[in-house]
Amino acid sequence: MNFIKDNSRALIQRMGMTVIKQITDDLFVWNVLNREEVNIICCEKVEQDAARGIIHMILKKGSESCNLFLKSLKEWNYPLFQDLNGQSLFHQTSEGDLDDLAQDLKDLYHTPSFLNFYPLGEDIDIIFNLKSTFTEPVLWRKDQHHHRVEQLTLNGLLQALQSPCIIEGESGKGKSTLLQRIAMLWGSGKCKALTKFKFVFFLRLSRAQGGLFETLCDQLLDIPGTIRKQTFMAMLLKLRQRVLFLLDGYNEFKPQNCPEIEALIKENHRFKNMVIVTTTTECLRHIRQFGALTAEVGDMTEDSAQALIREVLIKELAEGLLLQIQKSRCLRNLMKTPLFVVITCAIQMGESEFHSHTQTTLFHTFYDLLIQKNKHKHKGVAASDFIRSLDHCGDLALEGVFSHKFDFELQDVSSVNEDVLLTTGLLCKYTAQRFKPKYKFFHKSFQEYTAGRRLSSLLTSHEPEEVTKGNGYLQKMVSISDITSTYSSLLRYTCGSSVEATRAVMKHLAAVYQHGCLLGLSIAKRPLWRQESLQSVKNTTEQEILKAININSFVECGIHLYQESTSKSALSQEFEAFFQGKSLYINSGNIPDYLFDFFEHLPNCASALDFIKLDFYGGAMASWEKAAEDTGGIHMEEAPETYIPSRAVSLFFNWKQEFRTLEVTLRDFSKLNKQDIRYLGKIFSSATSLRLQIKRCAGVAGSLSLVLSTCKNIYSLMVEASPLTIEDERHITSVTNLKTLSIHDLQNQRLPGGLTDSLGNLKNLTKLIMDNIKMNEEDAIKLAEGLKNLKKMCLFHLTHLSDIGEGMDYIVKSLSSEPCDLEEIQLVSCCLSANAVKILAQNLHNLVKLSILDLSENYLEKDGNEALHELIDRMNVLEQLTALMLPWGCDVQGSLSSLLKHLEEVPQLVKLGLKNWRLTDTEIRILGAFFGKNPLKNFQQLNLAGNRVSSDGWLAFMGVFENLKQLVFFDFSTKEFLPDPALVRKLSQVLSKLTFLQEARLVGWQFDDDDLSVITGAFKLVTA
């Protein structure tokens, strides 16, 4: 009793909670303490209070109880017992014994059994070596708020080491390898930060059993017989911070199996040894409060991933894999997780040549590995409960994709066995500095894979309820833009998981194209025209561009699904139905391998496409030549011989079938040699019909005639900002099967026998576009003569011309003097005269099919008002008119009332342009009264730029303007207009109600920052 009493202060300070509980258990078994007394001691939160309580209880119970207390103390903390008796165990061990033990450890850390490890578990016979495959990790030090505050290297971490140090990271981040590396570095003696440690012990906590001493002996090496357990524990106390414990995997540790290791972490102040412990994110909450330093393992760097791949794979396989990763943004993101790098390499191992595996294959391997690797953790869990939890995890992922949710709450996992999802590694749990826990998949792409896997199982289930559920998810995908963006990865992994699921997906996508939202675009690609207007305004450039963007992205999505599918040939019929009538864009500078597979394995699908768009770029050659000139022309023999890559030739020319239509675009060619022309001829021959576009190609001059001679099947030609010789122009007008001709920015002099002289030869033309072409009055007259022969033309654009005298009079007369099929006429900024407008007005009865009439940006001088009046008065014959943009002149605003009266009879009008009409408050009120009657049911575009309306006038107009619910575009630009605050407020209210608005032009309106803050919305606002 006196011994305990005399040493009570030391006992209270040094026993520790773990030893107190162990002694309490012994005393309960020996009937010294009853259950109530045990509860009192164990419920104490402070270890000193617990120690004080048990000592006072024992002293009251007499000497026999005190002897039993000392017996238990001797068992559980022998070094403390010896110290209290005035005996030190440490002196019993010689320095030589310690040196021998340290050397044995160092030797162990350099043996093959320690350096070689199974990165995917012992069931898979793939071995990595720690020396050659370790890459420098990225570590982040965390503060008390659990925020990243500093990036650390491994050496930086060791130099700043505090105990306990907690290293957290999601599964597969390389935490175990990191601790093994530290042990190896200590053993080598080459790491300065580790030389201060006498011993470094690496322990796997999943295998910890018994006491600390027993675990060390079991996992590392047999400690010499001269060092007993009590002596060893005393040595640890004596060496203090010269001993480093590397404790791997607290998330797999069972504290009851080894209370001493638990105490080493949570009561580190008693042991005084240094500790680094790793854990997964979801288990961090169990030890975070005890950490003196917390570090997170960050993403693997791209250089580290490449180094690892090159180290573990033979050169050919490594280069193939690195090329595949370079082409895939998704794979590049996944390579930030070391385990995924390992899996990607492992799939290639044993192969004689590189095989480009699909992302589904990689994720499937990863998913199954997680389940297999952690199956031992689920003993006692019923198989049905386990499967139900996995299904719920898939449902969670699937719902998350559709609701754009990638962070989940407790209620989301409350209906299943949370432990199953966490221990398999499918979900990660985040609790640090959070009132409510957050659950996430380790990567967004992994959530999409899990969702796709689940959708596949639903679509192929034998249970009708599950099939209905799966089809319900497909029915939510009704917009092409959503399918090609939001749901593209989900569909990819669904198709990669099952042939039958792919069949269901492709049938749905074919139905979407037929009946769904074909023209729905993502916000970043919203069209100027809404879908409804496109149905009424036919053959417009806007419509064609919009459809091309949508259909191309849709087709690319289909090819990716084909690529991902587990069986290509079995689904040929479904894929062919999907590709029927669609288009595909190909960049010749980056033709992916899967296109060759697509053409080879599904030739019927490729030929089912409506047309292929192929782009060639000459800029690389031009820049190379400039560099050669800058260096005096050195190494000219190394210049590439052709612009046209042979890869493009092999893709098209080696193909055994024909495309319906091929659209080839040449851009920025500084020259075109004979081999290029031969290559183009081979490519052109792969299509039944050809469209050729030439943009900014100075080098085509003189060669275009040769190019066209290889085009036996061309029906559309567009030349933009590319000079032409007289031979080129003559050859263009000799291609009599042309249906579309578009010439832009052609500024060389018109020569006899050239373009304007001979356009009449192209009698099959249906569309003629001439923009910014240099010509004089004589050229215009010749052009007019040629137009008389173009009886099939339905679209004519003549824009941005100058100095053509009275040439427009002749052109307008040729266009309108006889009944024709013209549906669209654009005569924009082309010296249109009042006389030409009169001629047009008098001949409107010959243009009854006209849908779009654009005469904007033309100033009518003499007799302009009279001409405009006459045009307006005769407009009643244009029963299909949907878009009207008028010219301007002096006092044209006087014609507004007459115009609006006629427009009341044109309910299908969607676009009206009165640019530079200089409308005043009077006219804007007249216009407001017109719109107040709501005569135009689907009105969408209004251009009143160049007005003179005051704030009062605009305020009056706003009351009606806000009712134009279908509006997508307006232009109210003017000069130096300072709007009143009341107008700004009203404008902001109106704009918020125009939910379809995509662009508002208010150039010249003098807004300050406050004004802009209230009128800015989801639309594009142009003020300068």
UniProtKB/Swiss-Prot annotation:
Keyword Phosphoprotein, does the record have it? yes
According to its UniProt entry, one GO biological process term is: innate immune response
Q: Where are the LRR repeats?
A: 578-598, 656-679, 735-758, 762-785, 787-812, 824-847, 848-870, 878-902, 911-933, 936-963, 965-985, 999-1021
Quote the entry's note on domains. Answer: In an autoinhibited form the C-terminal leucine-rich repeat (LRR) domain is positioned to sterically occlude one side of the NBD domain and consequently sequester NLRC4 in a monomeric state. An ADP-mediated interaction between the NBD and the WHD also contributes to the autoinhibition.
Q: Where is the CARD domain?
A: 1-88
Q: How does it assemble?
A: Homooligomer; homooligomerizes to induce formation of the NLRC4 inflammasome. Homooligomerizes following activation by pathogenic proteins. Component of the NLRC4 inflammasome, at least composed of NLRC4 and caspase-1 (CASP1). Some NLRC4 inflammasomes contain PYCARD/ASC, while some others directly contact and activate CASP1. Interacts (via CARD domain) with PYCARD/ASC, pro-caspase-1 (CASP1), NOD2, BCL10 and NALP1 (NAC) by CARD-CARD interaction. Interacts with EIF2AK2/PKR.
Give binding positions for ATP: 169-176
Q: Which UniProt keywords apply?
A: Apoptosis, ATP-binding, Cytoplasm, Disease variant, Immunity, Inflammasome, Inflammatory response, Innate immunity, Leucine-rich repeat, Nucleotide-binding, Phosphoprotein, Repeat
Instruction: Tell me one Pfam family matched here.
Output: CARD
**Name by which UniProt lists this protein:** NLR family CARD domain-containing protein 4
Effect of mutating residue 443 to P: In FCAS4; the mutation increases oligomerization of the NLRC4 protein; results in hyperactivation of caspase-1 with an increase in IL1B protein secretion
Q: Give the molecular function GO annotations.
A: ATP binding; caspase binding; endopeptidase activator activity; identical protein binding; magnesium ion binding; protein homodimerization activity
In this UniProt entry, the residues modified to Phosphoserine are 533
* Organism whose genome encodes this protein: Homo sapiens (Human)
Q: What Gene3D superfamilies does the record point to?
A: 1.10.1900.50, Death Domain, Fas (1.10.533.10), P-loop containing nucleotide triphosphate hydrolases (3.40.50.300), Ribonuclease Inhibitor (3.80.10.10)
Q: Name one GO cellular component term.
A: canonical inflammasome complex
What this chain does, per the record? Answer: Key component of inflammasomes that indirectly senses specific proteins from pathogenic bacteria and fungi and responds by assembling an inflammasome complex that promotes caspase-1 activation, cytokine production and macrophage pyroptosis. The NLRC4 inflammasome is activated as part of the innate immune response to a range of intracellular bacteria.
On the tree of life, the source organism's domain of life is Eukaryota
Keyword Metal-binding assigned to the entry: answer is no
Q: Where is this region: Nucleotide-binding domain (NBD)?
A: 95-298
Summarize tissue expression.
Isoform 2 is expressed ubiquitously, although highly expressed in lung and spleen. Isoform 1 is highly expressed in lung, followed by leukocytes especially monocytes, lymph node, colon, brain, prostate, placenta, spleen, bone marrow and fetal liver. Isoform 4 is only detected in brain.
Instruction: Quote the subcellular location field of this record.
Output: Cytoplasm; Cytoplasm, Cytosol; Inflammasome
> Domain NACHT: where?
163-476
Q: So what does mutating residue 341 to A actually do?
A: In AIFEC; results in a gain of function mutation with constitutive activation of caspase-1
User: CDD domains, from UniProt?
Assistant: CARD
